[in-house]
């Protein structure tokens, strides 16, 4: 039913993702409901700032707390997705130590640290892949 609504209205949804970097590697997660790698993140709730949504999703999905000041906006993009327009802010944070990642095995079923050169060869959510490629170009 929602897909029919999306096809007719083409609403804009808002999301926030966080690329976690440590020791030259990036954390990729696999969600139970999509066939590709992504980063911790999700929908921005009505009235919520994207940065706060990113912080909330980090705790919910991988049990990690960082401060708002540690997040840097890496990429902001709007693209068609499942009959709607998805506006996504991708943040990144450089971690000094490798954190313990707690996967809930419901929404997030896998978390792996990989070199960015490897990440861009994997089936990664396209806007996220663009942010990783941008990071490589610096």
What kind of feature is each model-predicted range?
Residues 11-13, 21, 83-85, 106, ...:
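A generic fold-level signal
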Residues 90-92, 102-132:
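NUDIX/MutT-family hydrolases
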Residues 16, 21-61:
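Conserved Nudix-box catalytic region and its N-terminal flanking loop in Nudix hydrolases
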Residues 65-75:
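A short coil-to-beta-strand element that immediately follows conserved catalytic motifs
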Residues 1-17:
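Acidic, metal-coordinating catalytic segment for phosphate/diphosphate chemistry
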Residues 77-100, 112:
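Active-site-adjacent beta-strand/loop module that shapes the phosphate/pyrophosphate-binding cleft
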Residues 40, 46, 93-94, 116, ...:
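Functional cleft and adjacent loop/helix regions within the main domain
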